[in-house]
Amino acid sequence: MDLASKYHDSSPWPARGKQQVLFILDIRNSFEQELLRGWIHQHTPSGSEEFQAPQVCLNLGHDRKGMDSAQLVMALALPADTLITPLRVAWLPSPKAINSGPRLRDFVFGDPRHPGTHRGRKILSQRPERVHLIAGVPDSVANLRTRFERRHSVEDEKAQQDFASFVARQAVVVLDLAERRLQGGRYKVPRHVAASLKTNTAYNEAVDEIAAETGTPKAELMKEAAGYMDEMVSRPSTFWLDFYAKFNKFCLGLGYEEEIVYDQAAVEKMRQIVRENPSMLLWTHKTYLDGMVVPKVLYDNDFPMPHMFGGANMNFPGLGFLLHRAGGIFIKRSFRDNELYKIT
């Protein structure tokens, strides 16, 4: 299948009447930008409609670095019924890579799901079936603004910037949902948690109360809270989830038989519960090795990654790095008098 065939498989344009369209292109490099713009152009009958459909290019993948939504602030000055449509290039690993899990070469050349420009061109040329163009579910500016105003302050001088960041985060949500249909449910991960919390109205009101009670400027408290978020917020990725599963398999093999015995019917029942309700899984363990069993079973059954709470003393070099990128949340053993830590 060549690139032209991929372009014709589906259209990035949403169903609409006379509404304008704003495309958000989630790109990591110039090649992905080229692919997505070519996809848009391929389905533009006259070519003139592109001028009525602004395109904002953002790298939405860096949770820690944040995102520069300045372009989006200006682009959102569009009619309220404008449809915002996010686009992304999804890269599937080779069947060999899926079966083997992360390999040494992946540490050298990077995650096969996130290739650079040169590697991406090579994959498209030699293994085009691994390249997918995906569009997230579109939504109107009006609907997004209504949802934003329910939980965020609109009086703040940074309201427009916060709204643009909110729109970008919603683009991540719908794109991740579309990509999981290709990659698998085990890769459902939270994104931009700290950024969402910092702009949340309820959280800001709680910080305001602490500022009033202690006399500490809010800006200083928010800076302190950002440090707590950096410690606690897990930043999982597809690569490290795969690596953690492989690591668990290796460790469990040191003390147990290769096959893990469990009740498949109970797993399916739990899947339904987790799908329909916020859930907390509690399991016993005699050793730290036992704590690897449940995450491994869930991974093998294509469950969303479970968040695992652990003491901050476990956040040491090596293991802390891995767990932080595989769903681990480290909290202090004692924070009785630290109200800011509690609300964070």
Question: Can you say where each PLM-predicted feature lies in the sequence?
Answer:
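Membrane-interfacial terminal anchoring regions of lipid-handling membrane enzymes
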Residues: 1-344
